[in-house]
Amino acid sequence: LDSVKAAKIISQLKEQEALKILTGLSKKQLAEILAKMTPEQAASYTEKIAASQE
């Protein structure tokens, strides 16, 4: 699954489901997928992922 398709699919999931998937990815995969999302979505997920790792 390429990052464009993954970003589209993840964007359509409920937030908690999306976060479970995103936090399980490698940093490289995560960066590639976030880069394909809207800036707003990427920022939101990045903030929530960072908060969950504190």
Identify the function of each model-found stretch.
Residues 1-54:
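Hydrophobic packing positions in regular secondary-structure scaffolds
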